[in-house]
Amino acid sequence: MRYDFYAYMDRMKFIKRWQLMRSTREENIMEHSQSVAMLAHALAVIRKEVYGGSVDIAKTVLYALYHETSEVMTGDLPTPVKYYNQGIHGAYKELEKRACEKMAGMLPQALQGEIAPYILADEKSEEYKLVKAADRLSAYIKCLEELRSGNSEFAKAKKSIEADLHARNMPEVEYFFEKFIPSFGLTLDELEGM
């Protein structure tokens, strides 16, 4: 029997983000997922090592790695459309859930127990909350990159995403802002000069 899961996942590289905005550099959901996994890992480690919190770091990273799985079937719906009203948002959440269930069903039964739980994440878990913050951090960093390249198209998005991140009242996010975000405004020569 043939299983299509990884062939579908490999198509993440063809699905573009920020479709309604002019970008100086396109971003696909595969590279975005890698960014979110790295940032979620950082936030989980900060929670555990800096603040003494309890979190499953591996689960956080795996939730992040698979957090865009549904989009290989649905595409990336622009945020203003996704959150236009409760009805659209609820319908889209249901569509995402069904797409994730379908994707999990594309794995051999022997693998589903170890992979499906990360595709069908527990959205109420602390690990998933860190992933959602990392997802927004990734978007914020994209805004910084675009603004640094002279693209003012991302100014409003940067402002609203930054406000959202601070409104989460997550010490891990504030720590990341203080310790790491300033470096995203530096050139390669400035980074090497530190």
Over which residues does each language-model region extend?
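Alpha-helical, largely C-terminal catalytic domains
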Residues: 1-194
